[in-house]
Amino acid sequence: MWIANSSSTSPVLAPFIYGTLERLLLPFGLHHMLTRIDTAGVSGISGVPWDAVELPSQFMENWCWEPEALAFISGHYETGEPLPKELLDKMLAAKNYQAALFILRQLEFGLFDFRLHAEFRPDQGAKILETLAEIKKLVAVVPSPSWGRFPHAFSHIFAGGYAAGYYSYLWADVLAADAFSRFEEEGIFNRETGQSFLDNILSRGGSEEPMDLFKRFRGREPQLDAMLEHYGIKG
């Protein structure tokens, strides 16, 4: 994938790195643009609980890895040929390399965030590193060095707006993968499936409970299977 090189005066092309495509689709804005809710406080992403606010953005990334979708948006800059299937398979394998460790790391972050906000008592002093060490014993594969001070740089839960909400990244991954699995079953460009996602997810903003909206779209509560399969982890 390529884009015009705006930093050059010559008519050359600059590579559109694959990660850039993911970043383009991640904050694509459909949740805001397609809202049908007139009340500002619950339209678009406004008023959407942390449990589901990342669902549409992570959902959109799935199209980056579908051959049928890539045929529309990719092409060799000289021949116009779409991305070869064998190259996509290699990219998928690279994406899923050590995916299980990534999931465990996200669980570690989420649990640490929860416990930090649920158990902190100013009069008893902060047990930040002790709390992290306890969590790592539960979920971490590789121990941290004794001099490690990761919590001091965990900006998401202090300055990033995700205090007691970091878990939503991984939970949104579950929701997004499970929602996309319906498209995999019915066709990634199936018009009726897309309309259902618009009617039940994108257009509703924060006007209803996310679980109710998800069940209307998927016909059931979320399941983990699709997310694990997307990461190449199959039982």
Regions found by a protein language model. Give the residues of each.
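Cation-handling catalytic/transport regions enriched in His/Asp/Glu
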Residues: 1-235
